[in-house]
């Protein structure tokens, strides 16, 4: 059972200083994979040993999950993985701005909490300011991967990403939704959904060479995004 927290509550609006790659990793110059909303960390705990040439950072807003994930990481002695507690829409932009050029090479947002209602729009994980920060940190050709089992969760993300004009789908990807996960291990949620015979909606994007838009312009477009597939979740 997924337990939500309100990212707009006062506690989660307090900025948290995040450690730099140099503070987290002995080999800090490795390419960096950022997993936003890593939950208990099972995905990264499985991925990090398979990709020792990468550093992996998982960020999560639920502190008990981060503590649990860090304990597991330490037991496994994974030196190319760290888990951080923060509200990404409060604390991540400054951290991204400080990264060395082209260190961030892959971003994943997988099965984010489903805030359906329009009045909860600002609680969704992918906000315009975060997308612009990611687009600024990612160099052309670097990748952003999103997936969810809820169409009305991923469609607004897709619309926001595509309205930014900063990302394009790979030229050989002509399907509405990507069939296979490009990553070598699934998340816990992904395994559960597929075991139930249900669909997972996926999109892989590559950063293009377009300049990131002004925040006010993207926010204006974002206000038009209102869960096109799930009318039953809209406010009365």
From Swiss-Prot:
Gene Ontology CC terms: tRNA methyltransferase complex
Keyword tRNA processing: yes
Enzyme Commission number(s) of this protein: 2.1.1.33
SUPFAM superfamilies in UniProt: S-adenosyl-L-methionine-dependent methyltransferases
UniProt cross-references to InterPro entries, sorted A to Z: SAM-dependent_MTases_sf, tRNA_(Gua-N-7)_MeTrfase_Trmb, tRNA_methyltr_TrmB_bact
PROSITE patterns on file: SAM_MT_TRMB
Tree of life domain: Bacteria
Pathway(s) where this gene product acts: tRNA modification; N(7)-methylguanine-tRNA biosynthesis
Catalytic function, reaction form: guanosine(46) in tRNA + S-adenosyl-L-methionine = N(7)-methylguanosine(46) in tRNA + S-adenosyl-L-homocysteine
Pfam (any one): Methyltransf_4
Catalytic-site annotation from UniProt: 113
Binding site residues for S-adenosyl-L-methionine: 35, 60, 87, 113
UniProt keywords, alphabetically: Methyltransferase, S-adenosyl-L-methionine, Transferase, tRNA processing
Family: Belongs to the class I-like SAM-binding methyltransferase superfamily. TrmB family.
PANTHER family: 3-DEOXY-D-MANNO-OCTULOSONIC-ACID TRANSFERASE/TRNA GUANINE-N 7 - -METHYLTRANSFERASE, TRNA (GUANINE-N(7)-)-METHYLTRANSFERASE
HAMAP family from the UniProt entry: tRNA_methyltr_TrmB (MF_01057)
UniProt-recorded name of the protein: tRNA (guanine-N(7)-)-methyltransferase
Organism: Prochlorococcus marinus (strain MIT 9313)
């Amino acid at each position: 059972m997924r337990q939500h927290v309100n990212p707009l509550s006062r506690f989660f609006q307090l900025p948290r200083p995040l450690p730099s790659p140099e503070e987290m990793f002995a080999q800090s110059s490795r390419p960096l994979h950022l997993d936003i909303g890593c939950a208990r960390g099972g995905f990264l705990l499985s991925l990090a040993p398979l990709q020792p040439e990468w550093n992996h950072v998982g960020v999560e807003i639920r502190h008990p999950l981060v503590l649990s994930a860090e304990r597991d990481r330490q037991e496994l002695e994974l030196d190319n993985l760290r888990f951080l507690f923060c509200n990404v829409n409060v604390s991540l932009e400054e951290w991204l701005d400080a990264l060395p050029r082209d260190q961030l090479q892959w971003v994943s947002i997988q099965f984010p909490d489903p805030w359906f209602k329009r009045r909860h729009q600002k609680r969704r994980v992918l906000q315009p300011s975060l997308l612009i920060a990611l687009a600024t940190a990612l160099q052309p050709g670097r990748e952003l991967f999103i997936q969810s089992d809820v169409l009305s969760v991923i469609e607004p993300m897709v619309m926001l990403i595509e309205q930014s004009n900063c990302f394009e789908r790979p030229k050989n990807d002509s399907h509405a939704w990507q069939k296979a996960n490009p990553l070598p291990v699934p998340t816990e949620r992904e395994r559960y959904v597929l075991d139930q015979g249900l669909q997972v909606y996926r999109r892989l994007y590559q950063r293009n060479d377009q300049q990131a838009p002004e925040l006010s312009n993207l926010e204006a477009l974002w206000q038009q995004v209102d869960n096109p597939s799930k009318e039953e979740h809209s406010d009365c």
